[in-house]
Amino acid sequence: MAFRTNTSKAQEGGNSLKPEGDYEVIIDTAEVTRTQSGKDKINIVYVIRNDVQQAYQNGLIFDSIWKKKEPNEDDQSIGGYNFGQLMAIANAAKLPDGKEYAGLDDFLAELKGKPLRVHLYHDDYNDKWYEKIDRHEPTTLTAVKHKAKGKSAPAQTAAPATAPAQNAAPVSDPYPF
């Protein structure tokens, strides 16, 4: 099939840093995971909304919330994670103030699918640049018309396991590089 070049649509590889700034996003996943080195963290994946005129629509932004070295009482109520950071996300996602959750997993499940606005900046760590989020705000838009990017299920090549693995490998760092 023939095609023409169109350099106005040129873009760098998928692992390049997104520009610093504000992005309207939807929380795709929010879950407790473990790094390869055995540290627990809350991993939050944001999808850049495709119903808003902005660059990198359907792109992903990764955020991690780590356990505090010296957790206070509020932090301890959620397993030692930074309570203030999670409440900033809850406030931006417009979760009801004062609602009681049975546990951290229930709270994280309620975040899924919520729209908000994040501010992304670049952080230098060990001579590599990473995308980080330093601010969460409520979305500035009233209606959400984001369409999730279709995911095709992978073809099953083997019979499903009959029992869960006892020594499953921990989830690796969410950074794609």
Explain the meaning of each model-derived region.
Residues 1-177:
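Short beta-rich binding modules
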